[in-house]
Amino acid sequence: MIIIKNDTEIEYMRQAGKIVGETLNMLEKAAKPGVTTADLDRLAEDFIKKYNAIPSFKGYGGFPASICTSINEEVIHGIPSKHRVLHEGDIISVDCGAILNGYQGDAARTFAIGEISEEAAKLIKVTKESFFKGVEKAVIGNRLTDISHSIQEYVESFGYGVVRDYVGHGIGKEMHEDPEVPNYGRPGRGPKLVHGMVLAIEPMVDVGTYMVKTQSNDWTVVTQDGSLAAHYENTVAILDNGPEILTLCE
């Protein structure tokens, strides 16, 4: 069941989203060669708690950290570790969530570590742009898969693959609510978008095939062919005057 949010609930989510967006902005500056993913996790947890919010990932389904840190061919759900050191030329996707006043914010970014290849930079750019292509369709009266199709069409125009095994989702009091928000599919399908829907829209894109697999830790998802992957996500409210991105602080 899709849970429609009232204006008060959306304001709570706006506040939670601001903390998530600012956390990611802080982490982008901190993500440099020589830093470990555990360092980033500690910074994120401290930052979120400073604003009296709760890191929503920590303990979720047994996940051991406050952020997901996925490097290069890792797509999502990478576990921070003191043994994972960032190196010049890496790319890292950081997924972050926070709870404030009982409501969630969820977002992800992919960062460059020092100087990166042209291919990696293009992948990050296209993944981010595909999110905004999807958001253009996140308007009242459209169907859910209008978002999905717009993302897929844009990504595939560059020859990249759109991950299909993992999708975006509704969000509110719970991190994962209905509906699922695929990043692929035919337009004009799924529920009609209405005022008060809040969605986590999150294209996951790789340079090669869209096929992925899960590593032996049962969390980290990687590309099957070892190609680079990127992830970009925001929490988006569907409002009468158009979509509002709740986790974007630029």
UniProtKB/Swiss-Prot annotation:
Keywords: Aminopeptidase, Hydrolase, Metal-binding, Protease. Binds 2 divalent metal cations per subunit. Has a high-affinity and a low affinity metal-binding site. The true nature of the physiological cofactor is under debate. The enzyme is active with cobalt, zinc, manganese or divalent iron ions. Most likely, methionine aminopeptidases function as mononuclear Fe(2+)-metalloproteases under physiological conditions, and the catalytically relevant metal-binding site has been assigned to the histidine-containing high-affinity site. Substrate binds at residues 77, 176. Pfam families: Peptidase_M24. GO terms for cellular component: cytosol. One of its GO terms (biological process) is proteolysis. Its EC number is 3.4.11.18. It catalyses: Release of N-terminal amino acids, preferentially methionine, from peptides and arylamides. CDD domains: MetAP1. GO terms for molecular function: initiator methionyl aminopeptidase activity; metal ion binding; metalloaminopeptidase activity. It comes from the Bacteria. Its cofactor is Co(2+); Zn(2+); Mn(2+); Fe(2+). Removes the N-terminal methionine from nascent proteins. The N-terminal methionine is often cleaved when the second residue in the primary sequence is small and uncharged (Met-Ala-, Cys, Gly, Pro, Ser, Thr, or Val). Requires deformylation of the N(alpha)-formylated initiator methionine before it can be hydrolyzed. Monomer. Belongs to the peptidase M24A family. Methionine aminopeptidase type 1 subfamily. This is Methionine aminopeptidase. It comes from Clostridium acetobutylicum (strain ATCC 824 / DSM 792 / JCM 1419 / IAM 19013 / LMG 5710 / NBRC 13948 / NRRL B-527 / VKM B-1787 / 2291 / W). The gene is map.
